[in-house]
């Protein structure tokens, strides 16, 4: 969103504090805060993910401006006190998440407040439809190389809250099927991830094992792994997303996970070393990312002696050097078009 400040300039006169910047990438958010030039107490930046929250704070410091930065599972966890909600909508966000943010943003607007979407698309017909559906009317700026802005006024109190959640079932082998709730903006939305299935089908989990679901998303992997570990086993779910963690707790409870622990953290804080028999990782496919490095390097010291580390990927050549550097050795199991890398237990 490199033209966000130019796009915002076309609608800046409509903005009244206090302002909420709803999600959005760190640099566009920071540039908006700087452009607004409001007192720190008049601007709140909300994110769903602790890692993104940290990045927003770092970026605000880099551009030498300040705002309140909060992490929430849902925008409507905030009070309905804002006169303007700004949604810097990146092209990468999926339609369901965009709809979710617009609907939840309406709930935190005061009556008479303005909802403003900044889209980086030169021609965008999606937000006009979304905002008309929610607010009744929607104005827009002309199409331009800077993108388009869409603006709507909240004319009455919001109705009932509506979640854009999708339920699905999954099972591994002869295990019992489980039902999972998924929501936009979390891993494995709408269906059980094929890579996770490929990994669990070849994972060795014994009764009584202590399992870590690393980057758990909605908790489906941890719940299915916990069933394999049995009632004497233990599952720890960890994710940097508050929205994902809320879902993991919901799904674990619904599927009878009685010996479960839930950790919201960005860098595996709160996990004791040498405590896990099995660690399961399904990192983002941009394999050289900071998250993937953390998933690999941070896992080694968490394993018990003889513990097993599994990572599923479609790009094994991209992660193998880092896994070799971290664990010293590994093997690869091919399943369903995915490569499941096993490390930690080699030679044990």
Regions found by a protein language model. Give the residues of each.
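A short glycine-rich, Lys/Arg-flanked "PGG" loop and its adjoining helix->strand segment in the class I
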Residues: 99-111, 295-305
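SAM-dependent Rossmann-like transferase core, predominantly class I methyltransferases
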Residues: 2-3, 145-210
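Conserved beta-strand signature within the Rossmann-like core of class I S-adenosyl-L-methionine
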Residues: 112-120, 306-313
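Class I S-adenosylmethionine-dependent transferase superfamily signal
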Residues: 105-106, 131, 225, 299, ...
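Short beta->alpha hinge that forms the Motif I/post-I loop of the SAM-binding pocket
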Residues: 48, 97, 120, 239-244, ...
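Conserved SAM/SAH cofactor-binding pocket of Class I
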Residues: 1-64, 194-281
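Short SAM/SAH-binding signature in class I
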Residues: 82-89, 276-282, 310
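Active-site capping/gating segments
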Residues: 134-167, 173, 321-348
């Amino acid at each position: 969103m490199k033209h966000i400040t130019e796009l915002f300039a076309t609608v800046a006169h409509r903005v009244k504090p206090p302002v909420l910047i709803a999600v959005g990438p760190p640099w566009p958010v920071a540039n908006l805060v700087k452009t607004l030039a409001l007192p720190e107490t008049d601007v709140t930046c909300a994110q769903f993910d602790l890692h993104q929250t940290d990045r927003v704070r770092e970026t605000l410091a880099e551009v030498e401006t300040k705002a309140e930065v909060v992490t929430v599972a849902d925008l409507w966890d905030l009070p309905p006190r804002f006169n303007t909600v700004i949604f810097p909508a990146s092209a990468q966000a999926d339609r369901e998440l965009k709809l979710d943010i617009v609907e939840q943003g309406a709930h935190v607007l005061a009556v008479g407040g303005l909802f403003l979407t900044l889209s980086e698309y030169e021609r965008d017909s999606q937000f006009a439809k979304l905002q008309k559906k929610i607010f009744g009317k929607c104005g827009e700026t002309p199409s331009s190389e800077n993108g388009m802005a869409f603006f709507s006024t909240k004319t009455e109190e919001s109705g009932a809250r509506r979640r854009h959640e999708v339920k699905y079932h999954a099972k591994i082998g002869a295990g019992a099927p489980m039902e999972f709730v998924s929501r936009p903006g979390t891993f494995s939305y709408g269906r059980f991830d094929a890579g996770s299935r490929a990994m669990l089908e070849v994972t060795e989990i014994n009764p009584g094992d202590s399992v870590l679901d690393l980057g758990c998303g909605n908790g489906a992997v941890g719940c299915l792994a916990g069933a394999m570990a049995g009632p004497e086993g233990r599952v720890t779910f960890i994710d940097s997303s508050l929205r994902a963690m809320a879902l993991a707790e919901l799904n674990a409870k619904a599927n009878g996970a009685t010996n479960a622990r839930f950790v919201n953290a960005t860098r595996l804080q709160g996990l004791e070393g040498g405590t896990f028999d099995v660690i399961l990782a399904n990192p983002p496919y941009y394999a050289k990312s900071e998250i993937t490095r953390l998933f690999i390097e941070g896992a080694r010291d968490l394993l018990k002696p003889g513990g097993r580390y599994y990572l599923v990927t479609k790009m094994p050549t991209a992660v193998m050097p880092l896994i070799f550097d971290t664990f010293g050795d590994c093997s690869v199991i091919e399943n369903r078009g995915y490569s499941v890398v096993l490390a930690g237990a080699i030679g044990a």
